């Protein structure tokens, strides 16, 4: 509470003596190796897209400018030009083109569609998904969807990217919604 009253938002461009302590705390809490804090959800998703593409070119060996990221119909990841490029919301898209290429849309909560998209090309870099879709009308996937989607991504060397902006930090009863059925020791609250 005291910190929230002193400084709640800062950029990594400016030094503060709390960021390192926060990063240590949050990585230990979630069992992560690293964290890159962002100020907004759209900034977090844009950064995830950039990291995914960079990884695809430098680690997976996809030819430059050929990486594809799978996204779901009915998604809401923000309102930036890149993000609206793969949105179904015509109110968000109208008169903002041309749009950013490099995305494949599939049905949400459809493992067959995900597998078909992943195996359709050697240029698949990542799968960006909301653990619970909010913009589409609060759509909760089947109980095994996220775990099976992650396993499918791992089996095909595709990054699994969960957008927890609207669902994370215990908003769904789990620290992370993607861990709703988690049994990972020291990785979440269960």
Where are these regions (language model features)?
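Conserved N-terminal phosphate-binding loop of PLP-dependent enzymes in the Aspartate aminotransferase
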Residues: 1-190
């Amino acid at each position: 509470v005291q910190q929230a009253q002193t400084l709640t938002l800062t950029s990594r461009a400016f030094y503060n003596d709390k960021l390192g302590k926060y990063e240590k705390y949050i990585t230990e809490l979630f069992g992560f190796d690293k964290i890159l804090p962002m100020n907004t959800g759209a900034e977090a998703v844009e950064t995830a897209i950039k990291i995914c593409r960079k990884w695809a070119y430098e680690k997976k060996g996809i030819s430059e400018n050929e990486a594809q990221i799978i996204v779901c119909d009915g998604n809401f990841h923000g309102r930036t030009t890149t993000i609206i490029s793969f949105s179904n919301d015509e109110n968000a898209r109208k008169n903002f083109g041309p749009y950013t290429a490099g995305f494949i849309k599939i049905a949400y909560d459809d493992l067959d569609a995900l597998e078909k998209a992943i195996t359709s090309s050697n240029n698949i870099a990542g799968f960006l998904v909301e653990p619970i879709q909010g913009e589409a009308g609060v759509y909760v996937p089947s109980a095994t969807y996220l775990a099976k989607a992650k396993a499918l991504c791992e089996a095909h060397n595709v990054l699994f990217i969960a957008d927890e902006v609207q669902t994370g930090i215990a908003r769904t009863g789990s620290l992370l919604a993607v861990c709703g059925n988690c049994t990972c020791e020291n990785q979440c609250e269960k």
